[in-house]
Amino acid sequence: MNSLVKNRVFVLLLLVAVSALALAACGSSEEEKEGIVEGEPVALGSLEYNVLFTRPLNIDDVEDSQYLVGQPDPDPGTAYIGVFIKIKNTSEDEAHTLPTSFELVDTKGNTFENIPSESIYALKPGMEVGEEDDVPAIDSAAQVGPIQGSMLLFKMNDEAMENRPVQLVINGEDGPATVDIDL
């Protein structure tokens, strides 16, 4: 066999091996549920969560005022954090319930639970999501708003925001998932 044929055979075998490896990874039944990044959906049971955007909210900023309806000024050294999320119930025949709470956790293990919100953009933890429904609901203020997602509201201290990456913990039907949020 001449060297040109040997090289072609080698390249072909290498491509077959790489393709087989890629296909084997696609067949994995256990989806990764840790270290998800914003914009990457994660399925927990029939509910698919997608964290779109995270940012500190300023109570004195006109743009943020609708997200912070009814909230007092934050204590010195603390800030409000808005985590904007979309959720899809992929079940064709069954409603599913959202977790009753969500948490932000910094690298030192400090935990911050979402706080109640009166905002029209707020996600309501513990709510039922109908079969094949979306949160936020189609044509709702949150869905047609600037971010097009429902908001989870948190209050964090400034020190914890520096302990990155901060993760959103979602305790769903199939156990927890963690999403690295961009603060």
Predicted regions and their residues:
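Conserved functional micro-motifs across diverse proteins
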Residues: L21, A25-L183
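Sec-dependent bacterial lipoprotein signal peptides
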Residues: M1-A24
